[in-house]
Structure formats: C-alpha cells, structure tokens
Amino acid sequence: MCEGEKQFSYFCMDYGKGKVIYMYVTHTFEPVCDEKSRILILGTFPSVKSRENAFYYGHPQNRFWKVLAALLDENIPSSIEEKKKMLLKHGIAIWDVISSCDIEGSSDSSIRNVTANDIAGLLAASRIEKIYGNGDKACRLYDRSEERR
C-alpha cells in the first residue's frame, strides 16, 4: 500500500444554479511510506497543482517542502524522487484523508461528499506511531473517519 502513481478522474457537477462548479475528483496517487515510516502526515486532498504534478504539495507557493526541509536540516527537494527520499530517510509517511470528493478548485472549504482513504489499513500494514494533520480540516476529517470505524 505504499508508493505508485496514477491519474485523476474528473467529471463536473453544477451545484448552485450555474454559480459554482464542483468537480468530482478521485485521489489516485498512493501514500509515500515504507517499513521504516513512524510518522504519518495527513493532508486533506491534493490541490489542482498537486493533481497536475501527480504529487503532494505541488503548488510552487506551498511552504510544506521548505518548512519540512528546514526542520529536518535538509536541502529543499525539487523532484518527486528527492521529496520521497527525504521523507523516507526521516521515517515520515504522507497521505491524504480523502480518497474522492466533490471540490471547487483547490478549496478545502468547498469539499463535500467525501469518501475517506483506508488510513486504518495503512496503519495496520505499517509501523506508524504518530499521526499529524497538516491543518484543521485534515484533522477533523481524520477524526470523523476514525469515529465511523
């Protein structure tokens, strides 16, 4: 249940009499993790830029990779392979709470009709000890998915 990339699937839905276009989007790239991963950082759902780049935190203005590199005393990774290598070197896994949803652009506040990823399955197949959300929405969605189990 670790590594691998796929493409996203889309179809448009018009909610709100033509005012807002939500897209049904399926998250199709896998978590980054391995047998040494002890920390899991959960996001909500990839931004439009991340979906285009087929990897996490792909918008050039997103500070995730800069902050993480500073915390880990590493150079800022530029390629997907460098990002994966930095994460795994430090026992960090990343994934998103949401498997599919309706979303307007990249806005977490617009997310609706959520289907959660199988985080429990990832945890059972790994040695993750700590889970951190990268924001309030990710934490709330994770808590909600755990309550349903």
Roles of regions detected by a PLM:
Residues M23-R140:
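A polyanion-binding, active-site-adjacent surface
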Residues D143:
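Nucleic acid-binding interface residues in structured DNA/RNA-binding domains
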Residues K19-I21:
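Intrinsically disordered, compositionally biased low-complexity segments in eukaryotic proteins
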Residues E147-R148:
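Conserved small/polar residues in nucleotide/adenosyl-binding loops
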